[in-house]
Amino acid sequence: VVFHINQREDVEGNGYAVYLWDIAPESFADSIGVAQGTSADLTAYDGNTNTFALYGTTDTFSPLAEKVFDIWRYGQSAYIPSVAQMRLLYAAKAVVNPIIEKCGGDPLPDETNDCWYWTSTEVKGQQAAKAWLYSLGSGAMQETPKIQEHRARPIITLND
C-alpha cells in the first residue's frame, strides 16, 4: 500500500509502499559487539542501503535481514525502513490502515504492547550494540539491544 509520494530530489525513488504483513519477531543481529555498517542518521531515508549492509555483514548474522530477503522470492525488493521512513509511515497510518485491511493485510497497530518495530538505523555512538525501535502507536523511539527479537514491517521504494 502506497504511503508516501516523494517530492524531494535528494531522496531516491518516487515514493514508498508498505508490505501488508509483519515479519515475525527476529533479532537485528545474532550477537553484539559488531557495527553492521548501517547508518545512524535519524533523518536519512536509507532503509534499503541499511538492509543490504545488514545482510552483507560477515562478522555477525542478521536474522531480521535474512527474513526480509526471504520476501524477495516473491519478486518484491522489500527492506527494513530507516527511522525517517518509519516517521513517514506513522504519519500516514490512519490513511493506509483501511486499505491494508481491505487487501487482507494486518493493520499497523496502536496498542502499546504491540506497536514496536525494528528500524534499520543503528544508535549513534552505540552501533555495535543497539538499533532503534519505532512505535507505530505513538511515534516514539527506543534504543534497543540488537539481540532482542521484535517485528518489522518491510517497505519498498517505488521507481519509474
Positions of predicted regions on the chain:
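Carbohydrate-recognition loop of C-type lectin domains
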Residues: 138-145
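An exposed tryptophan-centered "aromatic clamp" motif
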Residues: 54-78, 83-136
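Extracellular adhesion/carbohydrate-recognition regions
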Residues: 1-78, 115-116, 127, 145-156, ...
